[in-house]
């Protein structure tokens, strides 16, 4: 065993590729017009797609219903691994008003104009006056601050705050200003509500359709997450909330957000506008590291294989970006336009799959395990102690898999935290837990559909035998291999306290 990550990498053999089934990280794909049919969804799943994402910034309820229906039909057509469904909220945002005649108005450098919250200009914007739909902008902004319009295509400096409704600004570059463009206020704390009326309606639509996770846009504080939890209510209590970190406030308040959220998405699009671009990759590494230590799943997203929207092959920089996200510790990576509107959606998923496979085998797993174990706060809870023991036993025994008999997915998540170099086979009767387990690195869900029997120990042995049989049939393990098992002493969630070593 190499004693450092450096020696591990120096001895790394890039030609050694694990079997196709054993990709540890998960791939999320946004479904759009190019991919919203059962045949294409089956192809995407065969290429490696694990989670379907619906972007609620676009599309009607009828359209999103068709995505859900087609995703579920694809599971009937092709069994494969369980498919999870995620709803991505539009989130609270700031936008410009409507220009006169819906025209684009050219803006030269050093051009002075007015930004106003006066509703009289809502549909009467031009190159002299532009309506901004954030009523409190004059209260939070100050002279010298920067305002970005249209994802930073246009930049303005605030000259003065003239009254409760009016800002005077100066353009810092040339461009065009037009209707309904996004507005960013980098370095300014805003007090937008966590949820718009549309977001609330969208989340209720997701609850009704039993989606597995909510990707919550523009999360700034822990209270934002709690507000979403209230909207989910009792009916949606099992839906995972993934907080999208997209602004400086979210970064500043990350520790409190991490305590209450189920997971995190590093959403680098808006984040790269809100904070200086050279800082984004460092913030990405920091947030992923914090999630890894807290055993919270983390997704890396935005422009990962962007050029594959129109080209059959990505740039080398994009491939490196995906690989480095995996090396940073991301549990999942996400595709947006590449699968929603791109010309090569299946190829994009396949490229991401192969890139993740290669990156995963470059990780120095023993060193990572020792580091994570040394940083865990003591004393650990019983379930986490069992997770550490299982991973340690897998190394000592040269085991080929860790089988976790789970009710809620907690035990599998904690084993995943310690990043074993063998697959974690999660056996559960809980279909929802199986599907959102795609959020956890290295977890492969197996849905055990036989009814529970009264004799607990016999029920445990039945599930274990079935899981081993399935894993052998899939080629994950072979007859005679050592495997480590994690199980509970009684029924219910949170009772895992037994680690065993058995032969397949």
UniProtKB/Swiss-Prot annotation:
Keywords: ATP-binding, Cytoplasm, Glycolysis, Kinase, Magnesium, Metal-binding, Nucleotide-binding, Pyruvate, Transferase. One of its GO terms (cellular component) is cell surface. It catalyses: pyruvate + ATP = phosphoenolpyruvate + ADP + H(+). The record marks 244 as: Transition state stabilizer. InterPro entries: Pyr_Knase, Pyrv/PenolPyrv_kinase-like_dom, Pyrv_kinase-like_dom_sf, Pyrv_Knase-like_insert_dom_sf, Pyrv_Knase_AS, Pyrv_Knase_brl, Pyrv_Knase_C, Pyrv_Knase_C_sf. Its main location: cytoplasm. GO terms for biological process: cellular response to starvation; filamentous growth; filamentous growth of a population of unicellular organisms in response to biotic stimulus; filamentous growth of a population of unicellular organisms in response to starvation; glycolytic process; symbiont-mediated perturbation of host immune response. PROSITE patterns: PYRUVATE_KINASE. The keyword Cytoplasm applies. Gene3D superfamilies: Phosphoenolpyruvate-binding domains, PK beta-barrel domain-like, Pyruvate kinase, C-terminal domain. Its cofactor is Mg(2+); K(+). K(+) binds at residues 55, 57, 88-89. Has antigenic properties. This is Pyruvate kinase. It comes from Candida albicans (strain SC5314 / ATCC MYA-2876) (Yeast).
């Amino acid at each position: 065993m190499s004693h450092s990550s450096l020696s591990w990498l120096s001895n790394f053999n890039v030609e050694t590729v694990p079997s196709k089934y054993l990709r540890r990280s998960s791939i999320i794909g946004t479904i759009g017009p190019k991919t919203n049919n059962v045949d294409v969804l089956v192809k995407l799943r065969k290429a490696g797609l694990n989670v379907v994402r619906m972007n609620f910034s676009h599309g009607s309820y009828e359209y999103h219903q068709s995505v859900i229906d087609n995703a579920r039909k694809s599971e009937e057509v092709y069994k494969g691994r369980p498919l999870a469904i995620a709803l991505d909220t539009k989130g609270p945002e700031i936008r410009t008003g409507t220009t006169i005649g819906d025209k684009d108005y050219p803006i030269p450098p050093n051009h002075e104009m007015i930004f106003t919250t006066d509703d009289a200009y809502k549909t009467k914007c031009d190159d002299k006056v532009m309506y901004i739909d954030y009523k409190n902008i004059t209260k939070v902004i100050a002279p010298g601050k920067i305002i970005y319009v249209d994802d930073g295509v246009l930049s303005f400096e605030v000259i003065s705050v003239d009254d409760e409704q009016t800002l005077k600004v100066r353009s810092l570059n040339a461009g065009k200003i037009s209707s309904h463009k996004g507005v960013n206020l980098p370095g300014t704390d805003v007090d937008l509500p966590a949820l718009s009326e549309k977001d609330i309606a969208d989340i209720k639509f997701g609850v009704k359709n039993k989606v597995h996770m909510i990707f919550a846009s523009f999360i700034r504080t822990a209270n934002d997450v709690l507000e979403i939890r209230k909207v989910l209510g009792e009916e949606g209590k099992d839906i995972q909330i993934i907080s999208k970190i997209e602004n400086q406030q979210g970064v500043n308040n990350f520790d409190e957000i991490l305590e209450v959220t189920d997971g995190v998405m590093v959403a680098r699009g808006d984040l790269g506008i809100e904070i200086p671009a050279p800082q984004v990759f460092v913030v990405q590494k920091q947030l992923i590291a914090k999630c890894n230590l807290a055993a919270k799943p983390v997704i890396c997203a935005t422009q990962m294989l962007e050029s594959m929207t129109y080209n059959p092959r990505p740039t080398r920089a994009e491939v490196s970006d995906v690989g480095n996200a995996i090396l940073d510790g991301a549990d999942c990576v996400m595709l947006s336009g590449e699968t929603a509107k791109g010309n090569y959606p299946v190829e994009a998923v396949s490229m991401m799959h192969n890139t993740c496979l290669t990156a995963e085998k470059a990780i120095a797993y023993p060193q990572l395990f020792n580091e994570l174990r040394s940083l865990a706060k003591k004393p650990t809870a019983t379930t986490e102690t069992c997770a550490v023991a299982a991973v340690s036993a897998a190394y000592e025994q040269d085991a080929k898999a860790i089988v976790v008999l789970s009710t809620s997915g907690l035990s599998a998540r904690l084993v995943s935290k310690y990043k074993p170099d063998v697959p974690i086979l999660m056996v559960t009767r809980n279909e929802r837990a199986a599907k959102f387990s795609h959020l956890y690195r290295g977890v492969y869900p197996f849905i055990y559909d036989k009814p529970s029997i009264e004799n607990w120990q016999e029920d445990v042995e039945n599930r274990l035998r079935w899981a081993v049989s399935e894993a052998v049939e899939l080629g994950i393990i072979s007859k005679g291999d050592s495997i480590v098992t994690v199980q509970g002493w009684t029924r219910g969630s949170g009772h895992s306290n037994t680690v065993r070593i058995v032969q397949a």
